[in-house]
């Protein structure tokens, strides 16, 4: 089936088990590419869908806003979201393309705690580590290893990376969960084939040496407003539910 770019993203529920972690519902927002044909009305509808799931925390995986006159309005809609444990995120490649300082301001206005090779701690002790975009900011395997070496191995650890690379390093560094976007699950032909040449994992849930790794197809689209066998989604990760 072809899923047009005007289609609303579907909720994709994914259950994972993480020993020692509290019950938690995590919503993911990735690759919304706001401002490129995605109206504020459509984004508001998607956010209403996301909020209706009542997630404990929202994790933003980059490529959020592109260009357009309504940057502040999009940011304010995100900031209005009722997320008990907060909103944390990382930059994607497009945050660098549209301007680093502009993107930092958008994240700030949207109430997103930006993680740039940093770790934050959620209320309750769960750690969230995030890296700059692996390719655009030239993050190395060693950078990932150094970041995760500083985390508390006695507490659950979530690792965020826009680009779905270095999963093995994340797993060996103690991450229990890893979340990425970027691929759009190919979005349309022929990119669905080309993306598989670039990345060992493109979409869905994987087990990497015991670490659960989910790659999302993204909230909307980039470029052509069409999707082929790669519907847009709002992932809701149910931990130990």
Task: Report each predicted region and the residues it spans.
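Acidic, histidine-bearing metal-coordination/catalytic regions of metal-dependent phosphoesterases
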Residues: 1-25
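Soluble catalytic domains of enzymes that build or remodel membrane lipids, polysaccharides, and related
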Residues: 17-241
